[in-house]
Each structure stands twice: as structure tokens, then as C-alpha cells.
């Protein structure tokens, strides 16, 4: 049995919230930049060029690629031989989202109750999908879901 302190989950989720809003995977960035050079439609070329400029600006200024940083959707694979210590696992994820969105200066746009429309001001709660898998590892993937998607 492997023990994992939930503070490590909080730290990892915080960092992933910030990074996933600022940096695209290298293969996706490369594909977009290649498309900029080969696109023949003027509108398509303009959109792709905007995306490339946004990626460059995000990297240089440490800001989000897009102003819509969305709602954090967290996919977790937890090994059946993992035992969390130091607190509640789901609360650790929500705290990581809270810290990542606030400290990363990401747009806070989640409401606590859809009828009251009151902003939580920290982008919680996150949507959490958890799978139990064999082993003693924990894998986290944070996917910000923009509200236009």
C-alpha cells in the first residue's frame, strides 16, 4: 500500500490548472503553426495566425492562451493500492483548482447555483471523473472546458 498525502494532489492540480491554460501540448502547437503556413483561405489563415500569436504571448507573458479559462474538469486514475492521507481527496482537488485559478490569475466564471447565478469567485467546484485502476500510482489530467464549447 502506497500512502499519498493529499497536499501533493492539491499542488499538482494547482500547477496543472495554470499550465493547461497557458501552454498547449507541443504536437498541437506544432500542428497549428504548420497550418498557418499552408492555409489558403484568408479567414482561416487569420484565425490560425491569431492562435499562433496568442500562444506566443501566453508563453512570453505567462498569461492564458484564451480569456475563457473555463471550468476545471479533472480526470483521475487512482491505483487500488493507493491510500490517501492528510485530508479528503476530492477536497484536495477542489483546493488545487481554487489555488490554481486564483493565483494563476485565471478567469473566475463558475457559479455555485445555476438559478441564483452567484459566482463562487474561485472556480470551484471542479468536475471530477475518477477511475480505480490496478497499481499504486495516481494520474491527474486537468482539462479546462471553456463555456463556449
Where are these regions (language model features)?
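Non-transmembrane, aqueous-exposed alpha-helical and coiled segments at domain scale
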Residues: 1-149
Amino acid at each position: 500500500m502506497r500512502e499519498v498525502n493529499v497536499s501533493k494532489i492539491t499542488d499538482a492540480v494547482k500547477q496543472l490548472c495554470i499550465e493547461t491554460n497557458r501552454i498547449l501540448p507541443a504536437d498541437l502547437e506544432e500542428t497549428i503553426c504548420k497550418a498557418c503556413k499552408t492555409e489558403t483561405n484568408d479567414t482561416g489563415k487569420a484565425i490560425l495566425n491569431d492562435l499562433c500569436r496568442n500562444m506566443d504571448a501566453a508563453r512570453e507573458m505567462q498569461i492564458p492562451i484564451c480569456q475563457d479559462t473555463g471550468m476545471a474538469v479533472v480526470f483521475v486514475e487512482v491505483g487500488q493500492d493507493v491510500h490517501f492521507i492528510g485530508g479528503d481527496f476530492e477536497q484536495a482537488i477542489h483546493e488545487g483548482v481554487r489555488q490554481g485559478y486564483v493565483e494563476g490569475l485565471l478567469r473566475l466564471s463558475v457559479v455555485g447555483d445555476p438559478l441564483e447565478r452567484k459566482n463562487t469567485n474561485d472556480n470551484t467546484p471542479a468536475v471530477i471523473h475518477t477511475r480505480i485502476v490496478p497499481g499504486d500510482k495516481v494520474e491527474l489530467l486537468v482539462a479546462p472546458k471553456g463555456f463556449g464549447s
